[in-house]
Amino acid sequence: MPSFDIVSEITMHEVRNAVENANRVLSTRYDFRGVEAVIELNEKNESVKLTTESDFQLEQLIEILIGSCVKRGIEHNSLDIPSEAEHHGKLYSKEVKLKQGIETEMAKKITKLIKDSKIKVQTQIQGEQVRVTGKSRDDLQAAIQLVKGAELGQPFQFNNFRD
């Protein structure tokens, strides 16, 4: 029976490249001359720390990071940006988390979405991925289009397509 897996993964190498590009853009920006501004990648925690001197500049750093990520093929909704900035002395900072894997709640939403659509496929939650199995490739492709079209707040990849 044909099947495929729905996953949510980010290539850390691409994130590293995006952070390096963002730092390069940061060094050439006129409005950041003489300002203490840093974009750091923490691969162990899967997060990016943004630090600068003002709240407005912090928002500019977020825009630079998002732009660099989009250029590297990382969707902007795979970044979990906190609404409140941390204030330490004269510096403002935000810890942007990278969304990896599908949480159980999101997997249940995907399963419910597919079952409610009456497409003749079966879904199984397997850890941080969802396996979709069906009798025909057309049903599987319809399920892919359904999940792509739904605004679930997280980017998904479809891999391991078996016939």
Curated annotation (Swiss-Prot):
* Keywords per UniProt: Nucleotide-binding
Role, per record: Nucleotide-binding protein.
CDD domains in alphabetical order: YajQ_like
A Gene Ontology molecular-function term?
nucleotide binding
Q: Gene3D superfamilies, alphabetically?
A: 3.30.70.860, YajQ-like, domain 2
Which family does the UniProt entry place this protein in? Belongs to the YajQ family.
InterPro entries from the entry? DUF520, UPF0234-like_C, UPF0234_N, YajQ-like_sf
Traced from the root, the source organism's taxonomic lineage reads: Bacteria, Pseudomonadati, Pseudomonadota, Gammaproteobacteria, Pasteurellales
Q: Name one GO cellular component term.
A: cytosol
Which protein is depicted? Nucleotide-binding protein APL_1231
